[in-house]
């Protein structure tokens, strides 16, 4: 007998502030299907940032955090919050992995290298963590400390990197240790789509001292701006000739979010890496990941291991014999699988996964704002019609990925592409007798411009919509958060809410 699926449809980066029209691609878009769904079915807004998702107050949400909270059915305190707390209470200075690996370099007269995203974006890393590790290195007596700074410009203003580098240099001057050895854009050093040609350029700067050259970090970033390249696209530049990573050194990757730290970590740590030829083979370094990037990664240690989550939605469905599908294009595949499952890499029994390749024929997604949404929708529709699944978790990447480009007209087209795709899958679910919970993981496309008209490329702290489609004439409450979604879904799946899920249903009895 064909199953009546319960779908969670996630419009990545689709924040909801209909009264703020300036620079709002969500409002500007022609989206008849979404407008009708929001008008004709019960709708509320839910919080997707700050303490509501386990981040510090006022911190914008992001895809990793959003999917983790949705899948867990409880507020999950994030690595950002946990690491910041460990600095404040002094626990970082006793962290056994950091102590051991720093000591190994110091005792051998070798260098400590800090590598990672610089700034206060808080999505992949945070300046406070750099400052904490630098203070720890000083406290332990380190003298050779080199910084390999990856510039942001996606989760922060595209020209904010200059200020972040100045703040970092001021800290180095204050402590009297550390030299910025290289500056690279995240486009090169933090790829997640196996564009090894990009990563190779960043690696060459870190290890061989090859690439552009500048006298210091400020000169490197100013030269990049003068060349029309914002933070994200800074061509890897060497700013200290003696700062190369060498055998016996300690490397600490400062990012706490896994997805964009995995590839560079694999280059340094995996003997079996084949993405490009590493001259002289793998560097024999002591490698520390700030958080766990991949449980299967060899030759590295994790400073802050993941908090174990039990009875997340995927696990709970599997235990109860339910079938489930996770589907997204490449850019968000990890989010509907690894992150939604609370950091578990392998699928649960009864969990099928389908990844649709993200476009490779464009360098940035503003040039193809529909991305692979039509293909995701077509595949999902076929899976719905198969009658095989009790639960489907689907992500459309467009509003987030195109939102990050800062190109307003393209973001509008991205919203319109999502409108068409959502209509296709919602219609299929309703025709199958199922229901859809339509939402987003965080805001982005609803704020594409700064007040002065310059592009705004980061996420926002805005709420996101939550629409209950085909769920009956229910009333939805205000003031909820992403952790409340799984407890809202479970009664429609025919299961009680497990005690581990502390989120509360968004449906008012």
Task: Label every model-predicted segment.
Residues 1-509:
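Feature captures the catalytic ectodomains and active-site-proximal regions of enzymes
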